[in-house]
Regions:
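Short, conserved turn/kink motifs that form compact alpha/beta structural patches or helix kinks used as
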Residues: 18-23, 29
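C-terminal structural segments of small proteins and small subunits
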Residues: 3, 11-12, 25, 41-71
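Conserved hydrophobic positions within beta-strands
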Residues: 14-17, 38-40
């Protein structure tokens, strides 16, 4: 499921990233690779703040739609 469908406080794991090669590369460079745990810190209208590895990142709704996760 897309990370968009998660809520504040959820702990999920990246399953895969979909989209163009450029989008996959950009999200991969940000740490969104299969198997990586992610904590949803804040979600508002699809824009999100997440904790991944030791960083907090803001991602847009468009980016979030490309990140598939699982609980």
């Amino acid at each position: 499921m897309p990370i968009l469908m998660t809520g504040t406080g959820d702990d999920v794991t990246v399953a895969k990233v979909i989209g163009t090669a450029n989008m996959k590369q950009r999200l991969g460079e940000m740490g969104f690779v299969a198997g990586t745990p992610v904590k949803i810190m804040q979600s508002h209208n699809g824009d999100m703040i997440v904790k991944i590895r030791d960083s907090k990142l803001a991602i847009t709704r468009e980016m979030a739609a490309k990140i598939m996760v699982e609980y």
